[in-house]
Amino acid sequence: MFELNNFESIKIALASPEKIRQWSRGEVKKPETINYRTLKPEKDGLFCERIFGPQKDWECHCGKYRRVRYKGVVCDRCGVEVTKSKVRRERMGHIELAAPMSHIWYFKGIPSRMGLLLDMSPRSLEKILYFASYVVVDPGETGLNEKQLLTEKEYRTALEKYGYTFTVGMGAEAVKTLLQNIDLEQQSKDLRAELKDSTGQKKVRTIRRLEVVEAFKKSGNKPEWMILDAIPVIPPDLRPMVQLDGGRFATSDLNDLYRRVINRNNRLKRLLELGAPDIIVRNEKRMLQEAVDALIDNGRRGRPVTGPGNRPLKSLSDMLKGKQGRFRQNLLGKRVDYSGRSVIVVGPELKFYQCGLPKKMALELFKPFVMDKLVKEGYAHNIKSAKSIVEKVKPEVWDVLEDVIKSHPVLLNRAPTLHRLGIQAFEPILVEGKAIKLHPLVCTAYNADFDGDQMAVHVPLSVEAQAEARFLMLSVNNILAPKDGSPITTPSQDMVLGCYYLTIEAQDGAKGTGMVFKDFNELLLAYYNKSVHLHALVKLKVTLEDGRSSLVESTVGRFIFNENIPQDLGFVDRKENPFALEVDFLADKKSLGKIIDKCFRKHGNTETAELLDYIKALGFKYSTLGGITVAVDDMSVPEEKKVFIAEAEAKVDKYEKAYRRGLISDEERYEKVIETWTETTDKVTDALMGGLDRLNNIYIMAHSGARGSKNQIRQLAGMRGLMANASGKTVEIPVKSNFREGLSVLEYFTSSHGARKGLADTAIRTAESGYLTRRLVDVSQDVIVREIDCGTEDTTEIYAIKEGNEVIEEIYDRIVGRYTIDPILNPETGEVIVEADSMIQEDEAETIVALGIEKIRIRTVLNCKTNHGVCSKCYGRNLATGKEVNIGEAVGIIAAQSIGEPGTQLTMRTFHTGGVAGADITQGLPRVEELFEARKPKGLAVITEVSGRVEIDETGKRKEVNVIPEEGETQTYVIPYGSRLKVKQGQMLEAGDPLTQGFINPHDIVRVNGVKGVQEYIVKEVQRVYRLQGVDVNDKHIEVIVRQMLSKVKVEDPGDTDLLPGGYEDVLTFNECNKDAIDKGLRPAVAKRVLLGITKASLATDSFLSAASFQETTRVLTEAAIKGKEDHLIGLKENVILGKLIPAGTGMKKYRNIAVEKIED
């Protein structure tokens, strides 16, 4: 049985005229739509019921047959079949053209496919198609050439000279004849022969032509099908016409475009019947050709056809293109039922896995379930009466709703959903009011706050969906962030403040210091009765499970904090001190993160969720009791500030004078002034921070990590310091005041530049970052974990990433959770630290770092041999769970989200380095984009292509660097004026090392250092940008993207294979192709690995559905149709578009093909 959704692949090809007529249910002959009086469709018109089906269910046009019992009857009066009106969404019609017309996609696309096949320029083709020139179709015995263009005058001359011995033509008919005359087999042979001798531009064109010829040859498409004899008319319900109030009609633009085609076609038919003069017929044909072009792709050639108000009409192509097109609007982004949205408010009383759902909303969302339960429990006899009970909201409805909701998770989503934690599942609790209640600890993942944010609720309906929501999406199962494996549910703000206040070090002379308590309850009693202060150092008798007991000394607050915290997290060595408190230190934000991390690794998510709720409750309670607040008096301006500023002003004065006397340049003066003020600001800040009391409220807030930073305290009570102007250059007049003293008018003005730039930057950044994420997702969406082990022997050497002496990423972060191939040994004793083929755990990684091992070989995604995905050994640990990654995990999407989500935090800045040449150093988001798009960077560095010793030769202003290898020729590099050298005389260099400062062009690295070099470079450079902004992203995410950028080879010599020279092929496909050739004893193809930017890589994917829904929709579809491409639905996007389950996670074939067998008891 053929199920609508049960297919393996989808194919696209050119439609032959026969095929178009076969699809059609009838010919549309009239341009009429509906009768303005009866409002019924006109016969043979664009909405004809005889062609497209009835407008009302089970009712023919004239009303002779009504009701279901006549199903399938064709009315003898009006010819309409009695059936469901739904068929008007699927039945097509057609228009028989009076003359063939060209399809604009194949004539006008770049490169013009018709032009390549006929070996004519698009300009000549345009002249023929739009009746400006004649073309010789058959030269006969004359001296003319086939496909030669003749003007009217030349044609007359030729006629006089040769008579009617030759044939010329005009318009699409002539082109059709030429296309029919093509012998593809012969042309393919000729072109391949031509390729061997041609070079340069000629070779490029030959390759392009060969590509098109091969495409037609292989796909079974015929070239003449690029010319239309009949035009399909899409179903009327996809181009509706609706009546507005006031009797006017709103119609889809397509109806206008079809109407123009039909009108002109009918006029042409009439002219031909009348035998009108050639020139009139030609003009009509040209107009028809233009109407057909506008229908298919309005605005592609000439001025677009406009509707009322000069708005270009939306053609068939526009229906597919862009964000509002069919692909992105309706196929990839559908709206769903059983969903609601509302404002969110904080729910500190909720458990970690709960959310509050407003009663009214819950009733509406769970209506079908409630109705079902009402019938089952006997409150109603049938669904109809149950519905009325729900609509009247009788009291029993609420009891039933409580029951229904109990174990039914709902999904909460906050837009923008930047990573997978933007949708999580919760168990709903009914609340009064109209707002959704959200647990405060999941706010970080959603990036939510309570200043009016809204969230959407979705109800998983099927049992499977509920199970997936509960086991995979429940907030308890999403404690770790997928981007770096750190807990994302760390307490923030008030909670941190409370825990910090609770665990402050013992205060001398606090009430009750030195008291001893026999158990925790006694201590609590004393605290509640105010006999002992929270920060008093006291002793408490601690009894272990085995009965041993001892007195432990700490503060009251720390005893309270530790009461419900597991005492085996590993902060204390229990062999040495079995009694000490686990958390006997200041619990600031970082420490709380560590506590949660250790708890998760030791006890798993359920216990961690309980711990989180405990910390949340404590934090809120004690930040309230502590009453930590901010008053003006907390900001004490340091006494020394005046002195520092006076000193600085004197220095600046000195520099000014030196500049006036010509001792230093303006450039130097500027540098020195900036330096002086920066120093002064730091001095004032240090004095301020030193003078703050450890119990000062502002200090507590900043130091605990709850809110604010040293930088902000400096602005409040120190000095604001230097400001940047709009172009990012530092203004040399500093803001000497702080907010406590107040700014002068000039200072306020100076500060306003930066503030405005900050806001503008944020807006641009959000859009840029969103687009980057979209491209990343597109390039990596089909990377799925396909198998356990691909069996590769290849490894990558890993070491800490350094920039000069500064470590950007530690080796620890790079190796933890990765697999080894060979065992890792202790260099001193030779004992095995990590076994061969096993995952490096935290403690093992710590040992490796402690032993000072600097380089380690591990398996990475870059070496994986799995086709269309990766294997779990090469990928290593799934950061979101802390365990080995499962088969079916969509690691490509996770990688894209992990890189894209922090994108908004990166800056847009380009730093301006001083100096004559003032090279801009691209940083932040633009730099990441430059790397992933594999663009040639701004501020290029010169690199050496050989390894050897450096000799610098300076003659006048010209600098030359000679690199002398051990053997072979010396390479000389001319250093561009204004570049800064990075190498010293006599230094030894490796091939690919930069000679000057700046960025290296990644394509050069591929050439000099090969694939491994460029992989390492991109990972290193992307990490540099993210780490400098304080964002941690794991290497493996970047590696997944880099792997996709390097997944293609460019064929240089096809050998005896079917590959086309200059074509892009998948590395693994190419290797298989060659293996087959070698097995058959043929000559294998030669190709080189290419680095493609992410946009290019997405468009080069094998799946045309994925590429078409990404960008350049018409170009992708044109190419796919000519090649007769088949999409095997390997990636996620293709399956979403076709409404199938995605082949990842639980939707994988491996998990779907499970039959349930009942075993007899």
Curated annotation (Swiss-Prot):
Keywords: DNA-directed RNA polymerase, Magnesium, Metal-binding, Nucleotidyltransferase, Transcription, Transferase, Zinc. Zn(2+) 1 binds at residues 60, 62, 75, 78. It catalyses: RNA(n) + a ribonucleoside 5'-triphosphate = RNA(n+1) + diphosphate. InterPro entries: DNA-dir_RpoC_beta_prime (IPR045867), DNA-dir_RpoC_beta_prime_bact (IPR012754), RNA_pol_asu (IPR000722), RNA_pol_N (IPR006592), RNA_pol_Rpb1_1 (IPR007080), RNA_pol_Rpb1_3 (IPR007066), RNA_pol_Rpb1_3_sf (IPR042102), RNA_pol_Rpb1_4 (IPR007083). GO terms for molecular function: DNA binding; DNA-directed RNA polymerase activity; magnesium ion binding; zinc ion binding. The keyword Ribonucleoprotein does not apply. Mg(2+) binds at residues 449, 451, 453. Gene3D superfamilies: 1.10.132.30, 1.10.150.390, 1.10.1790.20, 1.10.40.90, 2.40.40.20, 2.40.50.100, RNA polymerase II, clamp domain, RNA polymerase Rpb1, domain 3. Binds 1 Mg(2+) ion per subunit. GO terms for biological process: DNA-templated transcription. Zn(2+) 2 binds at residues 790, 864, 871, 874. One of its GO terms (cellular component) is DNA-directed RNA polymerase complex. Its EC number is 2.7.7.6. Its cofactor is Mg(2+); Zn(2+). It is an enzyme of class 2 (transferase). Transmembrane segments: none annotated. The RNAP catalytic core consists of 2 alpha, 1 beta, 1 beta' and 1 omega subunit. When a sigma factor is associated with the core the holoenzyme is formed, which can initiate transcription. DNA-dependent RNA polymerase catalyzes the transcription of DNA into RNA using the four ribonucleoside triphosphates as substrates. Belongs to the RNA polymerase beta' chain family. This is DNA-directed RNA polymerase subunit beta'. The lineage of its organism: Bacteria, Bacillati, Bacillota, Clostridia, Peptostreptococcales. The gene is rpoC.
